[in-house]
Swiss-Prot record:
InterPro entries: ArchSynthase1/Queuine_TRR, TGT, TGT-like_sf, tRNA_ribo_trans-like. Keywords: Glycosyltransferase, Metal-binding, Queuosine biosynthesis, Transferase, tRNA processing, Zinc. Zn(2+) binds at C302, C304, C307, H333. One of its GO terms (molecular function) is tRNA-guanosine(34) queuine transglycosylase activity. This is Queuine tRNA-ribosyltransferase. Pathway: tRNA modification; tRNA-queuosine biosynthesis. Homodimer. Within each dimer, one monomer is responsible for RNA recognition and catalysis, while the other monomer binds to the replacement base PreQ1. The gene is tgt. Substrate binds at D89, S90, G91, G92, F93, D143, Q187, G214. GO terms for cellular component: cytosol. It comes from the Bacteria. It comes from Psychromonas ingrahamii (strain DSM 17664 / CCUG 51855 / 37). Belongs to the queuine tRNA-ribosyltransferase family. Coiled coil: none annotated.
Length: 374
């Protein structure tokens, strides 16, 4: 993987990731394909939204169908028929999400499978082995996602464990002679001093890119923006910066303003299935009865398949009847909206007009623009 920084506007960065499987223009949003599919979408439909890279979930694919089945097809790209690059998370966040079903030890994590209740063990080495078999273009280190809230002592202990696991992930990755990219994950909760220690430790080990983890886990939005403003500028300029699990459209905008290059989140797909649709003028709740006879499209500025062919009344009707097509059309639109937003941000950075773009974005959705402390 090669990262090229093309130009900047304030802290925002316009760049390009180049892989053997193709290039990714940044800032980029990665749709989430947890089980080897972006829910309800064919790979061709995902591609048509403008997505250039997907996220796959190591934890879930390991438990079902298992790496052996996927490897028999070649790798995850072959299994799901996606031609572009794939980033896989390491499984750390999913283990964190299990709560009391898991025990964290120095060697790794013991937990009960959410599928059949059997005891399972996951370690940095096992995570690297799984991701190697998946053929991930970007491999994520295995880490512990520090919960929120956490005391200073708890955050320190968790962050130090993640650093030791980062070294073990790097060692196994190098043993494999894996030709793909390996990203480190900065932890440290909402404490600046621990974010510094984490980043210093990771840069000493050396990675192809750096993710910011442990945000969007329940902390106030102000804390997320504060940590981003603090740590993002300290990440090596020649490496991509990835904000994990974020987020709403305004979170993407604020992340870009603070120098983030990559994002992923289930929000556009999950919200689509629940009838929450993102548009240039804010969120439309398609289940609201006011849309029952509305013959307009979702978004007059959107050229996605859904907006070119269907009305709000039809989408309301499909949702009311529980038709699968409704969820699919909603998903096509939301993913297209996210990609259109990212394209707009990229073009604004290129033109040196990011803040003008951001002003218009907030005016249209009817929200106040957050202050940026630069």
């Amino acid at each position: 993987m090669e990262y090229k920084l093309i130009n900047t506007d304030g802290r925002a960065r316009r760049g390009r990731l180049t892989f053997d499987r193709g290039s990714v223009e940044t800032p980029a949003f990665m749709p989430v394909g947890t089980y080897g599919t972006v829910k309800g979408m064919t790979p061709e439909e995902v591609d048509a939204t403008g997505a250039e890279i997907l996220l796959g979930n190591t934890f879930h694919l390991w438990l079902r169908p298992g790496q052996k089945v996927i490897k028999a097809h070649g790798d995850l790209h072959d299994f799901m028929n996606w031609k572009g690059p794939i980033l896989t998370d390491s499984g750390g966040f999913q283990v964190f999400s299990l709560g009391k079903m898991r025990k964290i030890k120095e060697e790794g994590v013991y937990f009960r499978s959410p599928i059949n209740g059997s005891e399972v063990f996951l370690s940095p080495e096992i995570s690297m082995d799984i991701q190697y078999d998946l053929g991930s273009d970007i491999v994520m280190i295995f880490d512990e996602c520090t919960p929120y809230p956490a005391t200073e002592e708890e955050t320190d202990v968790s962050m130090q464990l993640s650093l030791r696991w980062a070294q073990r992930s790097r060692d196994r990755f190098d043993e494999q002679q894996n030709p793909n990219a390996l990203f480190g994950i900065i932890q440290g909760g909402c404490f600046e001093q621990f974010r510094d220690i984490s980043l210093d430790g990771l840069t000493n080990i050396g990675f192809d890119g750096y993710a910011i983890g442990g945000l969007a886990v329940g902390e106030p939005k102000e804390d997320m923006y504060r940590i981003l403003e603090y740590i993002a500028p300290k990440i090596p300029e020649d490496k991509p910066r990835y904000l994990m699990g974020v987020g709403k459209p305004e979170d993407l905008v604020e992340g870009v303003r603070r120098g983030i290059d990559m994002f992923d989140c289930v929000m556009p797909t999950r919200n689509a299935r629940n009838g929450h649709l993102f548009t240039t003028d804010g969120v439309i709740k398609i289940r609201n009865a006011k849309h029952r006879e509305d013959a307009t499209t979702l978004d007059s500025e959107c050229d996605c398949y859904t907006c070119k062919n269907y009305t709000r009344a039809y989408l309301y009707h499909l949702d009311k009847c529980g038709e699968i097509l409704g969820a699919r059309l909603n998903t096509i639109h939301n993913l297209s909206y996210y990609q259109r937003l990212m394209k707009g941000l990229r073009e604004a950075i290129e033109q040196g007009k990011l803040e003008d773009f951001v002003d218009t974005f907030y005016q249209r959705i009817g929200k106040e623009k957050p202050m940026l402390d630069v």
